[in-house]
């Protein structure tokens, strides 16, 4: 089965031209239907798609809050030994392409699915992370709390820019009974925590011991790519803490060369690359073939990944085909866009 399977519904047609980018103040979207109602009404649409999958993975289901109809589903299947990623947004290069709300960013968030050890029935469920791509509004959890990312193993529910997203586990067709009410009732309870590294109070004070009589899905709120300030086009800059440097990113475009020293915390949260002002070193990148938000450099499961965020001209190891996820396990030259090269060096 394909690593990423896509079903788009309700008028989400590609090649229709990408809507003009809209800059506006952050607002909290109005949810017209309750989350349970949205799930029950749309279950007959997405459940048959999910039942067909017997490999571990996740389904990302988007429901338009305005119409209360499912807009699409992306099935992301886990692989042994390598991460898989998918991107949601209003750009037609996105896997989960959504055009029903102009408030959604062209590239809203990426989902990174961790490798699995086995595909055998009963094996440990796939873990995943959702990372907001430094958008204006970010996301909300089902309790209405603003966030920039989550890490989870099990179902989660997110809301942003007029959509509700159900992220559900794949691999066991019996998780999707015929009755929508039964499916909702057996869905594990979502229990939210803050990661100790980014929460002043830590998560210990909020910790609830697991209950044997309940199925629970533990979700950790995380940070996303941070605002790192302006880096001028002449030389170099620092992303993160100078005293905790992880490595150096060298970017060479048609006329400019940029050096970014990146800290361990910044790598964990993610370093966003592209021509947009919300990306690191955007003022220094002079290649028009780069997308506004082109790639994400992030450390996941002790592996450094470059994730192409649905760019138009792609990301690739020089001499190879474009790829969505590239693991930097050695010194290697990458090409982003048509005329820009990039190399990572570990410093510590």
Q: What spans do the regions from the language model cover?
A:
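Forkhead-associated
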Residues: 77-157, 263-337
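Intrinsically disordered, low-complexity acidic Ser/Thr-rich regulatory segments
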Residues: 1-100, 117-122, 150-286, 340, ...
């Amino acid at each position: 089965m394909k690593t990423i399977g896509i079903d788009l519904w309700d008028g989400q047609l590609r090649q229709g031209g990408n809507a003009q980018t809209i800059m506006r103040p952050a607002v909290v979207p109005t949810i017209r239907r309750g989350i349970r109602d949205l799930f029950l009404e749309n279950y007959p649409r997405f459940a048959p798609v999910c039942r067909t999958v017997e490999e571990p993975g996740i389904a990302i289901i988007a429901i338009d809050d305005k119409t209360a109809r499912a807009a699409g589903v992306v099935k992301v299947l886990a692989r042994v030994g390598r991460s898989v990623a998918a991107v949601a947004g209003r750009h037609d290069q996105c896997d989960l392409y959504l055009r029903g709300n102009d408030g959604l960013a062209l590239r809203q968030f990426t989902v990174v699915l961790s490798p699995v050890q086995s595909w055998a029935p009963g094996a440990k469920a796939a873990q995943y992370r959702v990372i907001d791509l430094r958008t204006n509004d970010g996301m909300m959890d089902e309790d209405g709390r603003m966030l920039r990312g989550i890490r989870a193993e099990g179902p989660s529910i997110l809301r942003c820019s007029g959509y509700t997203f159900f992220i559900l586990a794949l691999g066991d067709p019996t998780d999707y009974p015929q009755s929508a009410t039964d499916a909702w009732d057996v869905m594990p309870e979502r229990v939210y925590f803050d990661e100790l590294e980014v929460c002043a109070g830590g998560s210990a004070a909020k910790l609830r011991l697991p209950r044997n009589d309940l199925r629970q899905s533990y979700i950790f709120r995380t940070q996303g790519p941070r605002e790192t300030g302006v880096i001028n086009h002449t030389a170099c800059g620092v992303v993160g803490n100078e005293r905790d440097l992880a490595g150096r990113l060298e970017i060479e475009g048609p006329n400019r060369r940029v050096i970014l020293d990146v800290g361990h915390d910044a790598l964990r949260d993610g370093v966003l690359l592209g021509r947009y002002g919300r990306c690191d070193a955007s003022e220094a990148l002079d290649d028009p073939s780069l997308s506004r938000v082109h790639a994400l450099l992030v450390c996941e499961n002790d592996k450094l990944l470059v994730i192409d965020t649905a760019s138009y001209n792609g990301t690739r190891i020089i001499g190879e085909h474009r790829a969505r996820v590239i693991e930097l396990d050695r010194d290697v030259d990458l090409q982003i866009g048509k005329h820009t090269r990039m190399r990572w060096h570990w410093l510590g």
